[in-house]
Amino acid sequence: GDACSLLNGDDCGPGELCCTPSGDHQGTCETSCW
């Protein structure tokens, strides 16, 4: 998905979550996190 950052708040679209598998602030927008 698109890049997102938890530091800037969740900049993902409706129904998308900012997934950060590495536990970092940087992640990607996905419909579900696993």
Curated annotation (Swiss-Prot):
Record keyword Disulfide bond present: yes
Gene Ontology molecular-function annotations: toxin activity
Modified residues (4-hydroxyproline): 14, 21
Any one of the GO CC terms: extracellular region
Alphabetical UniProt keywords: Disulfide bond, Hydroxylation, Knottin, Neurotoxin, Secreted, Toxin
Tissue specificity of this protein: Expressed by the venom duct.
Cystine bridges: 4-19, 12-29, 18-33
Annotated compartments: Secreted
Entry's free-text remark on domains: The presence of a 'disulfide through disulfide knot' structurally defines this protein as a knottin.
Protein name as it appears in the record: Conotoxin Cl6d
Organism: Californiconus californicus (California cone)
